[in-house]
């Protein structure tokens, strides 16, 4: 049964699903769609042509679908789409998009922690975690299963590849290749996100191929393009390696981050139980 508190403001025209809870003093504007089992906590504000997927919770004082912070916006009809079973925590802000018909999208099973900001025209994949105060500028693309630490700033038009992990307080100015881990301002790649991939049950053989790919691309004397070609020749049967190469070859407004933390070790075992080491 849907439960809307008497002090909540739900405008005529808002589409409310089954078993939705809207707590005291929350505001839901007329063009919003709340799917089944959504919870809108006290003082949350949801505006614009916003759709919130099943089972998602919007926590107190979060703001979703408000006017983009972009001087180019002239009142066009734009959208926000949030997937299923997400947690949009306190004071997070997800603005609407800029340019007619465009969408800010967030996938399923995402955790957006307090004070995070997702700007106009951003795209966020599934199973993503943004820690507190993560700040995405406009047009940023974030892949699936990405974790971004607290107080990270991301430049507009940057792409962050799937299964990557960005350390806290980093400044991201260029595209982050998938499956990598890094930190710093300026940002430096530290290697492959070995622990994260293991937790996602990526196979030992795939992790080993990705570590060798990273070393070939970022720590060899080959040119960037030549190293991408050579890893395809050696490890092209691994889908994750192909995805890594395709990401690096895609057109980019910011370019691929190539700064590497030379002190980061790539010689540790990627699975202690299996006892495998990677040659230095």
UniProtKB/Swiss-Prot annotation:
PROSITE patterns, per database record: HEXAPEP_TRANSFERASES
One Pfam family it belongs to: Acetyltransf_11
GO cellular component: cytoplasm; membrane
Cell compartment(s), UniProt: Cytoplasm
UniProt xrefs under SUPFAM superfamilies: Trimeric LpxA-like enzymes
InterPro entries in UniProt: Acetyltransf_C, Acetyltransf_C_sf, Hexapep, Hexapep_transf_CS, Lipid_A_LpxA, Trimer_LpxA-like_sf
An individual GO BP term: lipid A biosynthetic process
Domain of life: Bacteria
Catalytic activity: a (3R)-hydroxyacyl-[ACP] + UDP-N-acetyl-alpha-D-glucosamine = a UDP-3-O-[(3R)-3-hydroxyacyl]-N-acetyl-alpha-D-glucosamine + holo-[ACP]
EC number(s) recorded for this UniProt protein: 2.3.1.129
Pathway connected to this protein: Glycolipid biosynthesis; lipid IV(A) biosynthesis; lipid IV(A) from (3R)-3-hydroxytetradecanoyl-[acyl-carrier-protein] and UDP-N-acetyl-alpha-D-glucosamine: step 1/6
Gene Ontology molecular-function annotations: acyl-[acyl-carrier-protein]-UDP-N-acetylglucosamine O-acyltransferase activity
Assembly behavior: Homotrimer.
NCBIfam families: lipid_A_lpxA (TIGR01852), PRK05289.1 (NF003657)
Biological role: Involved in the biosynthesis of lipid A, a phosphorylated glycolipid that anchors the lipopolysaccharide to the outer membrane of the cell.
Protein name: Acyl-[acyl-carrier-protein]--UDP-N-acetylglucosamine O-acyltransferase
Source lineage: Bacteria, Pseudomonadati, Chlamydiota, Chlamydiia, Chlamydiales
Gene expressing this chain: lpxA
């Amino acid at each position: 049964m849907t439960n809307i508190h008497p002090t909540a403001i739900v405008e005529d025209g808002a589409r409310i699903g089954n078993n939705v809870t809207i707590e005291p003093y929350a505001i839901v504007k007329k063009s919003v769609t709340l799917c089944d089992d959504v919870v809108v906590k006290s003082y949350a504000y949801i505006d614009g042509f916003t759709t919130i997927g099943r089972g998602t919770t919007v926590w107190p004082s979060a703001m979703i679908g408000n006017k983009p912070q972009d001087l180019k916006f002239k009142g066009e009809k734009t959208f926000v789409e949030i997937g299923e079973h997400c947690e949009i925590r306190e004071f997070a802000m997800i603005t609407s998009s800029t340019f007619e018909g465009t969408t800010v999208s967030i996938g399923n099973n995402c955790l957006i922690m307090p004070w995070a900001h997702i700007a106009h025209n951003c795209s966020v994949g599934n199973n993503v975690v943004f820690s507190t105060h993560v700040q995405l500028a406009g047009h940023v693309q974030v892949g699936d299963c990405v974790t971004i630490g607290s107080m990270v700033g991301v430049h507009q038009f940057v792409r962050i590849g799937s299964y990557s992990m960005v350390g806290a307080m980093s400044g991201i100015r260029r595209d982050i290749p998938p499956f990598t881990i890094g930190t710093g301002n300026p940002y430096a790649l530290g290697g492959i996100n070995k622990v994260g991939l293991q937790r996602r049950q990526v196979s030992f053989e795939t992790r080993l191929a990705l570590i060798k790919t990273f070393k070939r691309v970022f720590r060899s004397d080959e040119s960037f393009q030549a190293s991408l070609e050579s890893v395809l020749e050696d490890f092209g049967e691994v889908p994750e390696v192909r995805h890594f190469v395709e990401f690096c070859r895609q057109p980019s407004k910011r370019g691929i981050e190539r700064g590497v933390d030379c002190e980061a070790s790539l010689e540790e075992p990627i699975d202690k139980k299996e006892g495998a080491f990677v040659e230095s």
